[in-house]
Amino acid sequence: MSRLLLIVLLACSIASAIGVVYMRHMHRKLFVQLSKLEHSRDELNIEFGRLQLEQATWAESNRVDQVSRERIGMKFPETSDIVVIRP
């Protein structure tokens, strides 16, 4: 009886040790994946900041005014061309 109990306890101990090793392996694997994802997130945040700066540059009113004058030939209307419409 005690020999059977010893064998059962030894088997449980080995199973527990294998479980600990497996969980540590999974922890390391997930930590590496997390590190890669954090690096990717940081790179995307940097790119997002650059894109926001670029968008702000292209959306400046003087830039829009310059492009509309050069490419489309737009201009501000003369005072005689302005018509005020009231309801």
From Swiss-Prot:
GO terms for cellular component: cell division site; plasma membrane. Keywords: Cell cycle, Cell division, Cell inner membrane, Cell membrane, Membrane, Transmembrane, Transmembrane helix. InterPro entries: Cell_div_FtsL. Belongs to the FtsL family. GO terms for biological process: FtsZ-dependent cytokinesis. This is Cell division protein FtsL. Residues 24-87 are periplasmic.
